[in-house]
From Swiss-Prot:
Protein name as it appears in the record: Potassium/proton antiporter CemA
GO biological process: potassium ion transport
GO cellular component terms listed in the entry, alphabetical order: chloroplast inner membrane
HAMAP family, A to Z: CemA_PxcA (MF_01308)
Top-level taxonomy: Eukaryota, Viridiplantae, Chlorophyta, core chlorophytes, Chlorophyceae
Pfam family, one: CemA
Species: Stigeoclonium helveticum
Length: 554
């Protein structure tokens, strides 16, 4: 039935049946059928051609203009005419999130790959009653556990000191007295290794080659007022040589060495040796500057505790540790200083006081960590109070830069940052390019729709005829599938994904309120239009299809 059929007294179904009967008995039946076939063929070809032109021509023009026209123009103006990298706030947040994730991944990988970074409770072995002179034989056990250094995100390094006391001359053991680990002190420093020069003290060192020198002051330190703090060198690797794995210090202190008791020059002298590449000092003299500025050497040559085999002449690289008790509180102030071939010109340092080690607070996370992993019951001993030995070790050779994984970390992080900057800069350029190219494609589509009215009418007629030629059950199934996909119960999730993609595609800020508003209104509009089409057109042309569709919905 068509809209042009007239309504008469005889039902139209009877008229159509009579017409079909007339065509079947008419001798020229083939000619109308051929004409109908040719018209259907023409309608099919025209529809395919129209659909191809309307769909693919705008698409190809969109791709071409995006690559060869808009992309170069946008890159030129975006990279050269302004300095922004991110087109909107969401791109910036994504970049920062990736940087944070990359930093956490680097830190995680570093903890996994670094051996003994957070070791368990240290294992050490010391015989209870060593024979005289056996201390050099125990250096491996001593040096392996004496100082542990740990890194925390709070920019702190933690040092653990073990102290021993022995009844002897400076390095020898006499009377066969026992030696055990004694008291333990935990210290933290905001920077791993700094230096302190004790007030009014000027320590000098004299190596076996006869060269001596004091610790130098920088130009900045010379400008400081009395009592101000100064920093000689910021980190341990800035020494003329840096500690290697399993390298250790030996520290000793001797009261009244070469100074008569009761004099104003009476002081405790601190000294130690740094085994490096299997060697130590052969001999070393220590002394103190008197009130007249003269260097007063000790009365005896000090022999090193450690054996001298494979010892290089490392006297030029001697290092001190100065130690002083603070106001009788039991808190220790420690410092490092150095003189060597790479040190600046020698200058006197006076009236300078720079503390770098501070006792850990009881509630600090570093102290909690030590108490959980490193606490032990240490035995004490008391031979005499005149000679003390302190052992400090770097067994794991961890970098002394706070929260620094390795030498390549900064370059790797910088490279990743540049990669992210380039990536999101290209994302911004792509978003602007997509917007311009899609507008061009839309303009071409509208132009074709206006100039191809007849072809599009034929296409519409062909599609309508194809749809209505189906059985009622098939038509109802297609209609149900279409409505459930676009306006069904689960469709809001799909529309949300589509709108998120469109916002990202065009570089628009993803406002969730706007997206939820579109998801809540656009499917409702489509549902209303679809129901109007069913009521206005489909109910007139195919009532059986409408009845089947309603039955399937129910």
């Amino acid at each position: 039935m068509t809209e042009l059929e007239k309504i008469g007294l005889i039902p139209r179904s009877i008229v159509r049946m009579l017409d079909r009967f007339y065509y079947q008995i008419y001798l020229g039946t083939a000619e109308p059928l051929v004409k109908q076939f040719r018209f259907s063929k023409y309608l099919l070809l025209t529809s395919v051609k129209s659909l191809f032109v309307v769909l693919f021509i705008p698409f190809f023009i969109n791709i071409f203009t995006k690559i060869y026209v808009f992309r170069p123009l946008v890159e030129y103006f975006w990279d050269r005419k302004q300095t922004e990298i991110f087109l909107n706030y969401e791109l910036q947040e994504k970049a920062f999130s990736e940087i944070r994730n990359f930093e956490e991944k680097m830190y995680f990988d570093y903890l996994i790959k670094t051996e003994n970074f957070f070791p368990e409770k240290p294992k050490y072995f010391l015989p209870e009653a060593p024979l005289p002179g056996e201390l050099p034989m125990q250096k491996k056990e001593l040096f392996g556990v004496n100082l542990q250094e740990y890194k925390f995100k709070s920019n702190h390094s933690c040092l653990k000191f073990y102290s021993t006391e022995a009844n002897s001359s400076v390095f020898g053991f006499e009377n066969g007295n026992s030696l055990k680990l004694s008291h333990v002190s935990l210290f933290a420093s905001k920077y791993p290794i700094k230096f302190t020069v004790i007030k009014n003290d000027l320590f000098k060192i004299k190596n076996q080659e006869g060269k001596s020198g004091a610790f130098p002051a920088s130009e900045e330190e010379k400008k400081l007022k009395k009592g101000e703090k100064a920093l000689l060198f910021p980190l341990l690797p800035t020494f003329s040589f840096s500690p290697r794995k399993n390298s250790s210090f030996f520290l000793g202190e001797k009261e009244n060495m070469g100074i008569s008791p009761g004099s104003k020059e009476e002081k405790k002298l601190k000294f130690f040796f740094f085994p490096h590449s299997g060697g130590t000092f052969s001999h070393c003299s220590l002394g103190i500057e008197d009130s007249e500025g003269k260097f007063s050497p000790g009365r005896r040559e000090i022999s090193p505790l450690l054996p001298g085999e494979h010892c290089g002449k490392l006297g030029k690289n001697a290092i001190f540790l100065l130690e002083e008790e603070k106001n009788g509180s039991g808190e220790t102030r420690a410092s490092f200083a150095t003189s060597g071939s790479k040190a600046p010109a020698l200058e006197e340092l006076k009236n300078q006081s720079i503390d770098f080690l501070i006792p850990l607070e009881k509630s600090s996370p570093q102290r909690t960590f030590f108490s959980q992993h490193l606490a032990s019951d240490f035995c004490s001993f008391d031979l005499t109070a005149q000679t003390k030995f302190h052992f400090v070790s770097f067994p794991n050779s961890i970098d002394t830069v706070p929260y620094n994984f390795n030498k390549n970390t900064e370059s790797i992080f910088r490279q990743k940052t540049r990669e992210l900057a380039n990536h999101y800069n290209n994302e911004s350029i792509s978003a602007i390019t997509n917007l311009l190219a899609d507008f061009m494609g839309l303009f071409i589509l509208l132009f074709l729709l206006v100039n191809m009215k007849m072809s599009l009418m034929n296409t519409t007629a062909f599609l309508s005829e194809s749809f209505f030629s189906l059985k009622d059950s098939k038509k109802a199934f297609l209609m149900l599938l279409f409505t459930d996909l676009l306006v069904g119960f689960h469709s809001p999730r799909g529309w949300e994904v589509i709108f998120h993609f469109l916002f990202e595609h065009f570089g628009l800020p993803e406002n969730h309120n706007i997206i939820f508003l579109l998801v809540g209104t656009f499917p409702v509009l489509l549902d209303a239009l679809f129901k109007y089409w069913i009521f206005r057109h489909l109910n007139r042309h195919s009532p059986a299809t409408v009845a089947t569709f309603q039955a399937m919905v129910e």
